Regions:
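Bacterial N-terminal signal peptides
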Residues: 13-24
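Conserved, structured core segments of small domains
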Residues: 25-124
Length: 124
């Protein structure tokens, strides 16, 4: 019995489809590193965030540890949806969020988009 998947062209197509499924193009949207002038413009869209080298950071303060952890839990869904994950430092009632695009070697539009979402979750 002859199978279409035994043909080299079919194997290449199947491989390409598998890769496209595993790595959708939306995961790579907005991943070009920004220039410093672009960063300077973008940082204005996320008040209270600070640039530290190739990272942007912001510390959120809450009434207690429980509220701080509840905030962190709210970050899971948007981070997963964006396929972009912040670095988090928790110190009792404070959560410091840091964003960078490691694969791009610096800050990208994705960092600022996620920073806006995180700011909304954190109350502005």
């Amino acid at each position: 019995m002859f199978s279409i998947f035994q043909q080299p062209s079919a194997k290449v197509l199947l491989l390409a489809m598998s890769i496209a499924f595993m790595f959708p193009t939306s995961a790579y949207a907005n991943t070009a590193p920004l220039t410093q002038s672009e960063i300077d413009r973008q940082i204005q869209t996320v008040p209270q965030w600070q640039q530290e080298g190739q990272t942007i950071t912001r510390t959120f303060e809450f009434k207690n540890f429980v509220e701080a952890i509840a905030f962190v839990e709210q970050l899971v869904e948007p981070a997963e949806a964006a396929q972009h994950h912040p670095d988090l430092a928790i110190s009792y009632n404070k959560v410091t969020v840091s964003l960078t695009s490691h694969d791009a070697g610096g800050l990208t539009a994705k960092d600022f988009e996620l920073a806006q979402t995180i700011s909304q979750i954190g109350g502005g």
